[in-house]
Amino acid sequence: MKIGIIGKGFVGSAVQFAFSPNTGCDAQIKVYDKDPAKAIHSIDEVVNDSDFLFLSVPTPSNPDGSINLDVVDSVLADINEVQKTKPIVLLRSTMVPGSSKKFQKKYPQLNIVFNPEFLTERSANFDFINQSRFILGGDEKNVKKCSELFRWRFGSTIPIIETDYETAELIKYMNNCFLAAKVSFMNEMRLVSDKCGADWEMAIEGFI
């Protein structure tokens, strides 16, 4: 298998780790990042010598709270410009439901699949190879090919959910929102603990 990685932050680096010889995998890996210090290959090399392209770039919030997809759009435009082969592009950035379909319509020559990440920055490598499920959203044929990639790498140890763009994107948002809700809940409970004089560490031990 030939794996291309665009965006070598902690998410892209986790993909590189998971498919590297360090984990017993023999995939051929090429890496591009806009930061020359992180880039190993050119974007042309990564795009045209890969079966699967993992795109992991930022989607920061705009001042009004909406998601800014400019970086994703820019990279997809670059891929579209240099593409000579037809790799599957796996989008891993957080996006509102409907975003992947819009990009697929804007760049019909690309094979786009939404494959959200569920990683924490400090343990991203471990999280990637031990995650509870893989989510794949998009065209059925492309999704099946991505499933084959993950089965090739992980066997049947990790469940794979195959669905459409919108459902995959919603799953990612649900996960993010639920995590935020848990953090908010625990922060509130800590305030209650401090106010009533409870032993917070013991409360945590008993709760978890």
What are the functions of these language-model segments?
Residues 25, 104-113, 124-208:
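Internal alpha-helical scaffold of NAD(P)-dependent oxidoreductase catalytic cores
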Residues 24, 48, 83-84, 155:
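Short conserved AdoMet
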Residues 52, 60-124:
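Rossmann-like NAD(P)(H) cofactor-binding subdomain of soluble oxidoreductases
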Residues 11, 94-98, 179:
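Gly/Ser/Thr-rich loops at beta-strand to alpha-helix junctions
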Residues 1-48, 52:
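NAD(P)+-binding Rossmann beta1-loop-alpha1 motif at the extreme N-terminus of oxidoreductases
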Residues 33-34, 54-56, 92-94, 135, 137-140:
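Structural motif
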Residues 37-41, 97-101, 141-145:
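Short, charged/polar "capping" segments at the starts of alpha-helices
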